[in-house]
Amino acid sequence: AAFIRMEPEFNPPMSGSNSICVATVLLDAGIIEMVEPVTNFTLEAPGGLIKVKAECSNGKANRIYIKNLPSFSNALDSVLEIEGYGAMNVDTAFGGDSFVVVDADSLGFRLSPDEAKDLAKLGEKITQAANEQLNFYHPTYSDWDHFSFCHFCGPLLGGKKGKNFKSAVAIKPGKIDRSP
């Protein structure tokens, strides 16, 4: 099965949250045969193939896991000038789409729901500044030459089940996405 995610300005090569939604609909609607307790299949997005593993029971997809497109860092420790904030160090990366990656702690964010409006506003400024001041390069998709989103990352924490961190992704127009 294939899908295309359409945006007002561009059509992203891949979307993690939309891949999860598409996989759920394909299974729950019976478009793809469900095998309980686990169904494996492949989705095709404009950027490439996405492996899907779905945990299923009672005719419903309960949990979806995806293997994203190959990811890479584009640049580390780049300096951006942001109006009202001054100079800021950022990384840039590709993980199904192009991101400006920012240390939320260094900007005073805890990544809590009450900060969503401020994160969305600043994220738009950061993404715009990156598109004006930095270059994005994808080795396969040469026409993908812009930054789509700002990914605010919290500190990496260790736990019994591995490492994790809080994050928030600012998307247009001034919103926070549910997944990076």
Task: Tell what function each PLM region has.
Residues 1-14, 19-180:
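Active-site proximal loop and beta-alpha junction motif in alpha/beta enzyme cores
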